[in-house]
Regions:
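Metal-dependent amide/peptide-bond hydrolase catalytic core
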Residues: 1-3, 13, 20-23, 39-48, ...
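Acidic/histidine-rich catalytic neighborhood of metal-dependent amide-processing enzymes
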Residues: 122-194, 243
Length: 290
C-alpha cells in the first residue's frame, strides 16, 4: 500500500521542474529559487520547516589569502521531535553544473530514461524521499517515529557551510538515510561512505634573483611539490590521496616565494582519519625544516 501511495505522487513532474532550475553550488540566485521550490513541496509534510542560513566558510585563494565563501540556504524540517524513535533523512539541492554550463535542461533519452542536471544526483532522490514521507504520513503508524530532513546547498563542494546543521540533526537518531543513487549497478544500498577532507597548504618561501643570488632564496614551489610527493605516499588500503592542484610560480628569473597546494584525502575509518591527520602534521613540519 505504501508503495502504491508513493507511486501516485507527482515525482516525475517535480524532477523535471527541479532539473530545469539551475542550482549549481555557486549559483546563489538559482539556489534561492531551488530552496523555495523545495520548501513549497516539503511543506505538504507536518512539522516545522525553515530555510537555514549557511555557516560562515572560508577558503584559501591562489595568493594564500583566506577569503569568505558564499553559500545558499539549507532546508531543515523537523517532524515529531518528541517521538521515541527518530530518523534523519538527508539530501542536497545543489549540482555540479554552473549557470554557464551548456547542460541546463532535462531531455528524454528513451521512453524510460530522463537525462538532466541533477536528475540522478540528486533531485530525483529528493522526489523519492518526499513521496515516501507523504505516503508514510497517511498511515496510522506514522505517529510511532519522528524525523528530521536536511537538504543542503553545498554538498558538491564539501558541505562546509551545512556541516554544523547536519551534525546537530544527526544526534540521537536511530538511523539515517541519504537519497543519492546507488553506486552499484544492481542498485544495492550503500551502508557507508569514506570520509572526505579537502586541504589547502600555503607554502611561503623567500624570493631571490635566479641569476644574482639564487642561494638566498627558498623555493616555495619546490617545497610544495616535495610535500605533494610525501602526501601521496600516505596512500594505503582504506585511505585515498589525490593531489589535485598546485598554484604558484613567478617569472623565470625569480625564485618563487609562494605556492598553494590542494589535496583531497578520503579515509574509510575514524582510525585512518586520525592517522592521516597526525601524518600530515608531521610531513608539513618536516618540509618546513628542509
Amino acid at each position: 500500500v505504501l508503495t502504491e501511495r508513493a507511486a501516485a505522487e507527482p515525482m516525475l513532474g517535480q524532477v523535471i521542474l527541479w532539473s530545469q532550475t539551475n542550482s549549481g553550488s555557486e549559483n546563489l540566485a538559482g539556489l534561492e529559487v531551488m530552496s523555495a521550490l523545495l520548501a513549497d513541496a516539503f511543506s505538504a509534510l507536518p512539522g516545522e520547516l525553515r530555510l537555514v542560513e549557511p555557516a560562515s566558510v572560508t577558503r584559501v585563494d591562489a595568493e594564500g589569502r583566506e577569503v569568505g565563501v558564499a553559500h545558499g540556504r539549507h532546508l531543515h524540517l523537523v517532524v515529531r521531535p518528541e517521538a521515541p524513535l527518530q530518523l534523519l533523512l538527508t539530501g542536497h539541492m545543489d549540482t555540479v553544473y554552473p549557470a554557464s554550463h551548456p547542460f541546463q535542461l532535462p531531455r528524454w533519452l528513451d521512453d524510460g530514461r530522463l537525462n538532466g542536471p541533477g536528475v540522478a544526483d540528486m533531485k530525483g532522490g529528493l522526489a523519492v524521499m518526499l513521496a515516501a514521507l507523504k505516503a508514510h504520513e497517511q498511515q496510522s503508524a506514522a505517529l510511532t517515529f519522528g524525523y528530521e530532513v536536511v537538504i543542503n546547498s553545498d554538498e558538491e563542494v564539501g558541505s562546509a557551510s551545512s556541516a554544523p546543521l547536519i551534525a546537530a540533526a544527526a544526534r540521537g537518531k536511530t538511523a539515517a538515510l541519504t537519497y543519492e543513487p546507488s553506486a552499484l549497478p544492481d542498485g544495492t544500498l550503500a551502508g557507508a561512505r569514506p570520509g572526505s577532507g579537502n586541504f589547502s597548504f600555503t607554502v611561503r618561501g623567500r624570493s631571490a634573483h635566479a641569476g644574482r643570488n639564487p642561494e638566498d632564496g627558498r623555493n616555495a614551489v619546490i617545497a610544495a611539490a616535495l610535500l605533494a610527493l610525501r602526501l601521496e605516499e600516505l596512500r594505503r588500503p582504506g585511505l585515498s590521496v589525490n593531489v589535485a592542484r598546485l598554484d604558484g610560480g613567478s617569472p623565470n628569473n625569480v625564485v618563487p616565494d609562494l605556492a598553494v597546494l590542494r589535496v583531497n584525502l578520503r579515509p574509510r575509518t575514524p582510525e585512518l582519519e586520525q592517522q592521516a591527520s597526525q601524518a600530515i602534521a608531521s610531513l608539513v613540519e618536516g618540509v618546513a625544516r628542509e
